[in-house]
Amino acid sequence: MSTQLQHARDGTVTDAMRRVADREGRDPEVVREAVADGHAVIPANHHHDALDPMIIGRDFATKVNANIGNSDTTGDIDDELEKLHTAVHYGADTVMDLSTGENLDGIRTANIDNSPVPVGTVPIYEAVTRVEDVTDITPDLLIDVVEKQAKQGVDYMTLHAGVLAEHLPLTDDRTTGIVSRGGSILSQWMTEHGEQNPLYTHYDELCEILQAHDVTISLGDGLRPGSVADASDDAQFAELDTLGELTRRAWDHGVQAMVEGPGHVPMDQIRANVDRQQEVCDGAPFYVLGPLVTDIAPGYDHITSAIGATEAARAGAAMLCYVTPKEHLGLPDAEDVRDGMAAYRIAAHAGDVAAGKPGARDWDDALSEARYNFDWNRQFDLALDPERAQAFHDQTLPGDNYKDARFCSMCGVDFCSMRIDQDARDAGDDADDMTELTTETDLSESAAAEVNRPPTGTHDAPAAEQAPSPGDDDDD
């Protein structure tokens, strides 16, 4: 079967492209051209029946990925489906199952069966769980894992194929060395075997598998900087040059490709990083982790990274990988997922507003109008997180009568600036101008993409009892 890239190059507008066009408020032909040029991807495995197609590309609304998954100490199917539900409910455009513990197949298939958004994985994690030692990994094992996950319905896979043996000495003087799990695993394998990265040497064979199932390749940045001290160094950019080569080779196989990026980057270097990736990788979508702009705030890295993510989105990054408050500290739970998603939906939206994406500011205007009109219920409805917005308001003013009040508990009755301003205008010569100030933006007519209009996400809680049992896991 052909991939979305091959269909696009043949001039065919697929059903997935039409659905994407509707969600983005764009012409289907614009979508087809972006996919054909490699400037956008539609991760849509032929076997993912629950998928509602979406698009990742710099000319479209900025997307957000949420990482979920268990570890060797936590998590079962019910826990993971709760994280999936939380992530999608609060606006995740894709999720990555990064499980490294037990029941990998059961968790992965449950996520795919229940997820309306694309599901990504890092296949080398499963490979590690199937051997006694990292050095026991073989090219055949990696190929087997990739093929199995492709058949299960995984929509995109991170492959750290650009980490080459000759790059490793470039990391010797780093402050934090190699911080990518995939990158460190492959570094150990290459060092102990004295051989080249098997994902690189067997890349063409892997691409043939991905093409057969239309799995998008997400070229992992195994040498991304793990501290601002290591940002934009020779190791990072040597790998990036290889990722540019691998992007073009994926396209030659008809495989959709996006490229992953840092990491930890000072604010003043972010735009240059985005521009460099776009040039080296011929405009392939850039998928960035953060980046964190400072390293001083464990427990608040959803904030330090959302700052960098906003600038990355403004500069042209196509998708942001969220960071939760638990980053560098522990495995996130459902509440951490909620906080991470809020930070990154804000970052993506703010980046789109700053970049002038069509209709992106309409949501802001609608909420500002409701705020000025003291329409509390509409403010809650339009909020990024309606439940939290109303809960915070109702902590101090819980009564229904306060939903008609022209103040909140921040300023009280006498010091509300908007009430004072309205009263002054009503009493003055420009009272007729109030009509202009209280017009209401019609979001149903907005040109904004779906992700830049409320609600941010809706998702029925998955039926955990229908998920595969732990006994179904092939990895045990």
Swiss-Prot record:
Keyword set, alphabetical order: 4Fe-4S, Iron, Iron-sulfur, Lyase, Metal-binding, S-adenosyl-L-methionine, Thiamine biosynthesis, Zinc
Molecular-function GO term, any one: zinc ion binding
Enzyme class: lyase
Low complexity composition bias: residue spans: 436-447
Known cofactor(s): [4Fe-4S] cluster
Residues where Zn(2+) binds: 264, 328
EC number assigned by the record: 4.1.99.17
Ranges of biased composition (kind: Basic and acidic residues): 7-27
Residues binding substrate: 67, 96, 125, 160, 180-182, 221-224, 260, 287
Cofactor detail note: Binds 1 [4Fe-4S] cluster per subunit. The cluster is coordinated with 3 cysteines and an exchangeable S-adenosyl-L-methionine.
Gene3D superfamilies: 6.10.250.620, Radical SAM ThiC family, central domain
Residues annotated for [4Fe-4S] cluster binding in this entry: 408, 411, 416
InterPro entries per record: ThiC (IPR037509), ThiC/Bza_core_dom (IPR038521), ThiC/BzaA/B (IPR002817)
Pathway annotation: Cofactor biosynthesis; thiamine diphosphate biosynthesis
Region (Disordered): 1-27, 425-476
Reactions the enzyme catalyzes: 5-amino-1-(5-phospho-beta-D-ribosyl)imidazole + S-adenosyl-L-methionine = 4-amino-2-methyl-5-(phosphooxymethyl)pyrimidine + CO + 5'-deoxyadenosine + formate + L-methionine + 3 H(+)
One Pfam family matching this protein: ThiC_Rad_SAM
GO biological process: thiamine biosynthetic process; thiamine diphosphate biosynthetic process
NCBIfam families: PRK09284.1, PRK13352.1, thiC
Family membership noted in the UniProt record: Belongs to the ThiC family.
Physiological role: Catalyzes the synthesis of the hydroxymethylpyrimidine phosphate (HMP-P) moiety of thiamine from aminoimidazole ribotide (AIR) in a radical S-adenosyl-L-methionine (SAM)-dependent reaction.
Database matches in PANTHER family: PHOSPHOMETHYLPYRIMIDINE SYNTHASE, CHLOROPLASTIC, THIAMINE BIOSYNTHESIS PROTEIN THIC
UniProt protein name: Phosphomethylpyrimidine synthase
Organism: Halobacterium salinarum (strain ATCC 700922 / JCM 11081 / NRC-1) (Halobacterium halobium)
